[in-house]
């Protein structure tokens, strides 16, 4: 099987090109220069004033991060300067990038906050050399995952079919049967893992030709240089004397102010530290690690049932990164004994996996349910899929920062379409759209300004979305037609676009008299 994995990996690498990496996604900045901060009387300044001074003195921190396409071009130029020729394929740069990182003994990364579900999630952006290394490590993980249909990040069709296939197999094998399921979600996924776990997995399955590359790449992962936002710097400077009971925060603040420990420079936004893995960076590799645990526990459960109870159960597992599920069908009607044994089997994996750094979140897991399983935020009750539309509806009234009203309407309509796709009825979508309209007009000040009545009159005469009028769908097709159809209806049935309509209705005559023709054509 190792020869087959090696052939598949080489084939995938051969089809890789610079276009797959040279995207418009962000790349990390260089971490060569420390942050310039003059002595400030922070007690006399607000946090925002401190922030403005830092941004003024450090222009590079304010600039947008370079795009991957620009970073790839710069890296190719460096390769050409050092090697004396241009790379013919992206894989030629892989050993060169890995050697540079191994000599540096770390890699650079930027960290920033991304709003998500009412809070912030940390997002990490790797430097371009590490991005190339990471891509090929993940590529090998994808090659292996394709041979395990239970892994859903590389086999997305499994998410929709695994419940149906399980019940189909159970019906064909048994006249009557009972099905017990487990929906498990792991907690602290990136904090609990270390790349040594993944290295041990690769040592068992990777071809000998790829082991040096994979092990050296994963050995780099614990050693990082992180650049965090300057907003955190201004917050620390403003609250240097604030009393805090957290020893971790106090240690971080002390090392920040003295330039010791993880900080190489005083009052800097660059730290060097050791940790396991980053959120989302080794996504497929961690999913493969979880697949190893799930598939082994499936074999173990089947063997226990077969040897101890003389039963051949139908067992199905499914997992994708930190999310997992398991279904066991045994012959006969449900009894207390069969339920107790099945739940013990389902709980077994959660107890064993703690020794492999996969910790089950009790709050987000349901173990031992009968004919009911949740996976990827979708509930399956036998052949029926139950989708929680609340997760989309709750996002419908989130307002994004836009420069034009029409952009806001497109975002609103896009989220509304997701509600419809997630299982909401057109009536629900119509009510959500009315709430979006109310929120939009409230943000314009219609509930507080004296000029609201006059604006109502103007909008009734000229419902122009570019001026703030909120277009709505027909109730029967809410979330279906889109903004373009809304604009078409406004153009056709209202005064909106009357000037454009008049211009389009003006036709040029095709008939000319002799007087209209020039002398040369008479």
Language model features with spans:
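Viral RNA-dependent RNA polymerase
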Residues: 1-522
